[in-house]
């Protein structure tokens, strides 16, 4: 599709329109095809690679720009780049039913892939296949949301699947080394955040290799930095812990 904008004599091609209705008005932005979903998933971070122009339209196909007073009333600002970001994140991507169906199917698959990669069966410590996760998502009638990133939705799926099957986030393996004088006190503070201690060496320094829930990593990192005043070290040994030699099962 080629769109001619008579107001500025720019011909926009390969256009994907994102639309938002706000304050009783319709606002549209012109984006490059295949870039909107990349932006929403976090894969694309350069706005200039997504937007064809940092302009807000009433109607992209007719080249009708939005009035400043309408933008101010609806969005509380005249900054068109910021408004473009809002529309890009929360607006409705205008695509054909076939295109929409294909995009949602791909997002469904991507979400299942993330869940399968990040989770295990807590009883066997074995990972699940993508196909099994897809079937489980269908069983709970999970509906993909085009405006949310696949990573965000994967977290939602994990929470919902916990109600129907044995599943949990795979553990992260860490090694941390802290000065001996901080060791005992710090270990007590870290205990509630550690799932399992694999090895512990207390000589001139305290060195511990342990498994944690990935959601606790930031808190552990902050604790070690604050309590040791930057003298402690924290190393991620593996992002997920599954039993070696085990194969994925359906």
Swiss-Prot record:
Q: Does the keyword Oxidoreductase apply?
A: no
Spell out the molecular function terms from Gene Ontology.
ribosome binding
Localisation: Cytoplasm; Nucleus, Nucleolus; Nucleus, Nucleoplasm; Cytoplasm, Cytoskeleton, Spindle
Tagged with keyword Signal: no
Which GO BP terms sit in this record? cytosolic ribosome assembly; hematopoietic progenitor cell differentiation
| Function noted in UniProt | Required for the assembly of mature ribosomes and ribosome biogenesis. Together with EFL1, triggers the GTP-dependent release of eif6 from 60S pre-ribosomes in the cytoplasm, thereby activating ribosomes for translation competence by allowing 80S ribosome assembly and facilitating eif6 recycling to the nucleus, where it is required for 60S rRNA processing and nuclear export. Required for normal levels of protein synthesis. May play a role in cellular stress resistance. May play a role in cellular response to DNA damage. May play a role in cell proliferation.
Record text on subunit structure and interactions: Associates with the 60S ribosomal subunit.
UniProt keyword terms in alphabetical order: Acetylation, Cytoplasm, Cytoskeleton, Nucleus, Ribosome biogenesis
> Which SUPFAM superfamilies does the UniProt record give?
FYSH domain, Hypothetical protein AF0491, middle domain
What the record says about family reads: Belongs to the SDO1/SBDS family.
Q: What is this protein called?
A: Ribosome maturation protein SBDS
Spell out the Gene3D superfamilies in the cross-references. Answer: 3.30.70.240, Ribosome maturation protein SBDS, N-terminal domain (3.30.1250.10), SBDS protein C-terminal domain, subdomain 1 (1.10.10.900)
| Native source organism of the sequence | Xenopus laevis (African clawed frog)
Question: Which residues, renumbered to this chain, carry the PTM N-acetylserine?
Answer: 2
Cellular component GO terms, alphabetically?
Answer: cytoplasm; nucleolus; nucleoplasm; spindle pole
Organism phylogeny: Eukaryota, Metazoa, Chordata, Craniata, Vertebrata
Q: Which Pfam families does this chain map to?
A: SBDS_C (PF20268), SBDS_domain_II (PF09377), SBDS_N (PF01172)
């Amino acid at each position: 599709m080629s769109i001619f904008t008579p107001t500025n004599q720019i011909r926009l091609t390969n256009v994907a329109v994102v639309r938002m209705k706000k304050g009783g008005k319709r606002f549209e932005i012109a984006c490059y095809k295949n870039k909107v979903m990349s932006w929403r998933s976090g894969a694309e971070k350069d706005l200039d690679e997504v937007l064809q122009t940092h302009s807000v339209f009433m109607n992209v196909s007719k080249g009708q720009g939005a009035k400043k007073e309408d933008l101010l009333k609806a969005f509380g600002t005249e900054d068109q780049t910021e408004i473009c970001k809002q529309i890009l994140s929360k607006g409705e991507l205008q695509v054909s039913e076939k295109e929409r169906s294909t995009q949602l199917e791909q997002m469904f698959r991507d979400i299942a892939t993330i869940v399968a990669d990040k989770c295990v069966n807590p009883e066997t410590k074995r990972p699940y296949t993508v196909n099994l996760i897809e079937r489980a998502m269908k069983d709970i009638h999970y509906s993909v949301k085009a405006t949310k990133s696949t990573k965000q939705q994967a977290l939602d799926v994990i929470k919902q699947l916990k109600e129907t099957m044995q599943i949990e986030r795979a553990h992260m393996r860490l090694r941390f080394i802290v000065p001996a004088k901080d060791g005992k006190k710090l270990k007590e503070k870290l205990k509630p955040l550690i799932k399992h201690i694999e090895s512990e060496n207390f000589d001139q320094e305290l060195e511990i290799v342990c498994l944690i829930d990935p959601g606790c990593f930031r808190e552990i990192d902050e604790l070690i930095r604050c309590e040791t005043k930057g003298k402690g070290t924290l190393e991620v040994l593996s992002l997920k812990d599954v039993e070696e030699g085990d194969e994925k099962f359906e």
